[in-house]
Amino acid sequence: MSSIRLYNTLTRKKETFEPLEPNKVKMYVCGPTVYNYIHIGNARAAIVFDTIRRYLEFRGYDVTYVSNFTDVDDKLIRAARELGESVPAIAERFIEAYFEDIEALGCKKADIHPRVTENIETIIEFIQALIDKGYAYEVDGDVYYRTRKFDGYGKLSHQSIDELQAGARIEVGEKKDDPLDFALWKAAKEGEISWDSPWGKGRPGWHIECSAMARKYLGDTIDIHAGGQDLTFPHHENEIAQSEALTGKPFAKYWLHNGYLNINNEKMSKSLGNFVLVHDIIRQIDPQVLRFFMLSVHYRHPINYSEELLESARRGLERLRTAYGNLQHRLGASTNLTDNDGEWLSRLADIRASFIREMDDDFNTANGIAVLFELAKQANLYLQEKTTSENVIHAFLREFEQLMDVLGLTLKQEELLDEEIEALIRQRNEARKNRDFALADRIRDELKAKNIILEDTPQGTRWKRGS
């Protein structure tokens, strides 16, 4: 039996993870609508579920990871009209930008990245099957899902039909039978991109796309379906209704949702002018700092984005990289074996066990990072020993590399620009002036790990790059 426990939105409790097939995991993550660059809220979902995939692979599971692109949609059509470009041209540009952004953030590509426009036939067949079973109906070229016919509607978002009915409205121009019904196929409007179908020219509704593509690439029932908390209702609720009405089987065994991201304690929105695009931020900071920041809070909890918290994340990542760099520098000056190798190797085994225990508990990356800080602390303690062993140093390095890789974090030391070095020296001088010697020493160690040598003189601090 697996020791991994995860929180299932469907049941609102932590459950032991038992995939449908032993050692195989089928995972579907809702991807972006590609009409613009992704924002840092999208980035949180990408980073969180990439990390969960990495951890499952680390624990020996064979993961098939599917994440879609919505490459036709109202937003894309509007963007095409505003920019005077075609929908496919805009989609292609932002799919390319998406791959650049997530690669910078340390996310691996999905095994399959299906696009809606490449799966129109599959979607049409799915809709026709729902019509044949009485779960959908056509009105003047539009096709709607008959929501009340599906008994389990509301089970994911834990809402009753009566509660949902109270807030439902029929928009002007809609001809559906019930305010709760939603569109599976939208009849074409003049000048819009469209495809031929049994109901005339049109395009798919948003919700049906994921149901059809998840089934095509992963089968009737998948292990994990994941996405942002904002997708729970109506998107994921509607996916369940569509898929389970068609197959009569559970659509997904486990539903995972990451929490919201706020900016300086306010919801991120274009109207507030606090909308942060990944494309912009990764040109200002090390993208790995953004990833570290996202993983420093449990994935289900809300996270607050601010300059101060980003700086704290930068310091945290630097602390780990510095400890790793110090170990590397000691390699040539160590002996083959020492008397206390066994004790240190035992400590390392305990650290790995702690990391696994924390990550097994609903992928708690925040506590996983705390374990990495303990690893850094033990590394620094070890380097204070009179004699060190290459055997133990290599074991420390391996733990750093493997556990950091699970979190998608790199240990590569970026070469500092001259201005960055000068800024750190000014920060160190300020710390010394304020008698914060711990901070001053930490900055000096950070620079030393990046091969920057400081010399304090009566005229001020000088620096040079080591050979």
UniProtKB/Swiss-Prot annotation:
Catalytic activity annotation: tRNA(Cys) + L-cysteine + ATP = L-cysteinyl-tRNA(Cys) + AMP + diphosphate
Enzyme class: ligase
Motif 'HIGH' region, residue range(s) on this chain: 32-42
Sequence positions bearing Phosphoserine: 271
Localisation per UniProt entry: Cytoplasm
EC number: 6.1.1.16
A GO MF label: ATP binding
Keywords from the UniProt entry: Aminoacyl-tRNA synthetase, ATP-binding, Cytoplasm, Ligase, Metal-binding, Nucleotide-binding, Phosphoprotein, Protein biosynthesis, Zinc
Pfam families, alphabetized: CysS_C (PF23493), DALR_2 (PF09190), tRNA-synt_1e (PF01406)
Keyword Phosphoprotein: yes
Any one of the GO BP annotations: cysteinyl-tRNA aminoacylation
Names of the cofactor(s): Zn(2+)
Main location: cytoplasm
Motif ('KMSKS' region): 267-271
Cofactor binding summary note: Binds 1 zinc ion per subunit.
Binding site for Zn(2+): 30, 210, 235, 239
UniProt-annotated binding residues for ATP: 270
Cellular component annotations (GO), alphabetically ordered: cytosol
Protein family per UniProt: Belongs to the class-I aminoacyl-tRNA synthetase family.
Subunit structure: Monomer.
Protein name per Swiss-Prot or TrEMBL: Cysteine--tRNA ligase
Native species: Geobacillus thermodenitrificans (strain NG80-2)
Record gene name: cysS
